[in-house]
Swiss-Prot record:
GO biological process, one term: NADP metabolic process
Protein name, per record: Soluble pyridine nucleotide transhydrogenase
Organism from which the protein derives: Vibrio vulnificus (strain YJ016)
Key words, A-Z: Cytoplasm, FAD, Flavoprotein, NAD, NADP, Oxidoreductase
One term of GO molecular function: dihydrolipoyl dehydrogenase (NADH) activity
Localization in the cell: Cytoplasm
Length: 466
């Protein structure tokens, strides 16, 4: 029995990081088990984060597209939906993703163990199953890929039926007419787009002086303007003093003296690593104040046989990066060293309505570094494909070195921005002289396409040189 419960590697968590590690390890011939605390695989990415929020966004954007299409407006037709009704679309996508990922484990003969894991000593974990029974498993090595969860400050009553975090909002049963979103990071801005797109009065409380300050200033300003134009009320530089749940809603008392009232509140201000229930001291580890673990270049923790990947190690906290980290940790375990590493310029995709995506440096970063750069711009309203699709809001901006023509940064705001960015990323990742803005002038694009924005922006930028 003890032999059957011993593995070469046990991976704790079946999100993107855990999946990447497990697949790499099983394909290398190791005996691997994956422990998942929920009843199905996929982790927070599949069940509460990336997949459901993007499915919701897609449904809302299609409703907006229908209602703004002149073909339907002429017939006085209008399509309406509530948050609770479009949740059905998100759940169908979650089910498909879960079945797909379950198949990966089945085909690769990777054992799945459902339950909550905690360390009991350096090489042993105890897994508590849903029925309360416990089973003990041992392994030579461990990979912690437990992800993160929404941060919940102690002075906010998340048990109140009208106060939600970004996980529990997916269980919203009523249909609010007015919502306050506290926290204007990526998650807060994405949900602001979703609720406003459904016609819900939306107030967005930002604890900083501008939205998504890590973005290029022009893109951040474009998002702020688009929110303002669509009716989202943004309160910058505000912090709550207390959040009061009432019988019919929520009142937010701000430190500035203002008060805000709505049917419900979505608290979306920060996340914390899921390490508190692992009993890390038993294996010689300790998470930091945010529940995160420190790792080296091989994703090895301070304990030699324990590795960690994904949100639980902090930046960049992206599903795409977590999967790559999982692959790299599998290489580190099987070969002693990871063959690859995360690229320096990881693209950012923000699924607001419209989308935002960027890769490389911002204008403010290049200006601070005194880099002689130039800017090439393309407005979507001038692209035939955007006009045909009725998606003419947005632009593409290319930042490049005035002397070498090297592409330094790309920033996109508009329909399919998260897809469009990868064209430029592919050229940016080329070595030496192959990374040049002139590529977009000298190549031939399909017409009409959104990708043609690169040619327009490149010509615009090169024409600025003298």
């Amino acid at each position: 029995m003890a032999h059957a419960n011993h593995f070469d590697v046990i991976v704790i968590g079946s999100g993107p990081g855990g999946e990447g590690a497990a697949m790499g390890l099983t394909k290398a011939g190791l005996k691997v088990a994956v422990v998942e605390k929920e009843s199905s695989v996929g982790g927070g990415c599949t069940h509460w984060g990336t997949i459901p929020s993007k499915a919701l966004r897609h449904a809302v954007s299609r409703i907006i597209e229908f209602n703004s299409n002149p073909l339907f407006c002429k017939n006085n037709s209008s399509l309406h939906a509530t948050f609770s009704t479009i949740l059905g679309h998100a759940k169908s996508v979650i089910d498909k993703q879960t079945r797909l990922r379950q198949g990966f484990y089945d085909r690769n003969q990777c054992q799945l163990i459902f339950g909550t894991a905690r360390f009991t000593d350096a090489h042993t974990i105890s897994v508590t199953q849903n029925d309360g029974t416990e089973e003990v498993y041992t392994a030579d090595k461990f990979v912690i890929a437990t992800g993160s969860r929404p941060y919940q400050p102690a002075d906010v009553d998340f048990n109140h039926e009208r106060i939600y975090d970004s996980d529990s909002i997916l269980s919203l049963k009523h249909d609010p007419r007015h919502i306050i979103i506290y926290g204007a990071g990526v998650i807060g801005c994405e949900y602001a787009s979703i609720f406003r797109g459904l016609g819900v009065k939306t107030d967005l409380i930002n604890t900083r002086d501008r939205l998504l300050a890590f973005l290029d200033n022009e893109v951040s300003d474009a998002l702020s303007y688009h929110f303002w134009n669509s009716g989202v009320v943004i309160r910058n530089d505000e912090t709550y003093e207390r959040i009061e749940g009432t019988e019919d809603g929520v009142i937010v008392h701000l430190q500035s003296g203002k008060k805000m009232k709505a049917d419900c509140l979505l608290y979306a201000n920060g996340r914390t690593g899921n390490t508190d229930k692992l009993n890390l001291p038993a294996v010689g580890l300790q998470g930091d104040s945010r529940g995160q673990l420190k790792v080296d270049g091989n994703y090895q923790t301070e304990v030699e046989h324990v590795y960690a990947v994904g949100d639980v190690i902090g930046y960049p906290s992206l599903a795409s990066a977590a999967y790559d980290q999982g692959r790299f940790v599998a290489q580190a375990i099987t070969k002693g060293k990871a063959d690859g590493y995360l690229i320096d310029d990881i693209p950012t995709g923000i699924y607001t309505i419209p989308e935002i995506s960027s890769v490389g440096k911002t204008e403010q970063e290049l200006t601070a570094a005194k880099v002689p750069y130039e800017v090439g711009r393309s407005s979507f309203k001038h692209l035939a494909r955007a006009q045909i699709a009725g998606k003419d809001i947005g632009s593409l901006k290319i930042l490049f070195h005035r002397e070498t023509k090297e592409i330094l940064g790309i920033h996109c705001f508009g329909e399919r921005a998260a897809e469009i960015i990868h064209i430029g990323q592919a050229i940016m990742e080329q070595k030496g002289e192959a990374n040049t803005i002139e590529y977009f002038v000298n190549t031939t694009f399909n017409y009409p396409t959104m990708a043609e924005a690169y040619r327009v922006a490149a010509l615009n930028g090169l024409n600025r040189l003298f």
